[in-house]
Amino acid sequence: MKNYKLDPDEFLNFVHDIDLSKLKKNSVLFKKINNLPGSKIIYTNGEKNYAEKVLKSLGVSNLFKSIWDIKKSKFIPKPEMSPLKNLLSTNKIDNSSCVYFEDIEKNLRPAHQLGITTVHITDKNPTIKKSYVDFRFKTIISALDMINKNF
């Protein structure tokens, strides 16, 4: 946005103009997230209002303590380290007891470097195992099952 002199709010409104009508409330997802210990925070390169709409569509919005969006990150996107460090310190999070779920593999690197357990959600079968990916699952449900059983 900075390099192209775009208004951040205008850009975010444009990229988040997405039809969410295909997203449905998911009682299984609600139960699995609700069973996770500790506080839950959404960390997104998107904007808070968009994240809230997605969470509401899935029926899980009341399960999250907060949303740390691109604006709270001072428009510094993942996978940069500084916004993640700021999120962790502001929320007084113990890195060693934290689990970071992500669908973009490279975004896991900073979390892993900080001692956070990393979980990559992807339907692809990567041929190369990355050292900064602790676990890989095809669905968020299977990842939540493992975390709820083992952490």
Feature-to-residue mapping (PLM):
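Short, acidic loop-to-helix structural element flanking the phosphoryl-transfer center
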Residues: 9, 13-42, 48-52, 78-81
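Short phosphate-binding/catalytic loops that engage adenosine nucleotides
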Residues: 6, 38, 116
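Short, basic/glycine-rich phosphate-binding loops at helix/coil junctions
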Residues: 3-16, 64-68
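Glycine-centered secondary-structure boundary/capping sites
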Residues: 4-5, 28, 59, 148
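Asp-based, Mg2+/Mn2+-dependent phosphohydrolase catalytic module
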Residues: 20, 34, 47-151
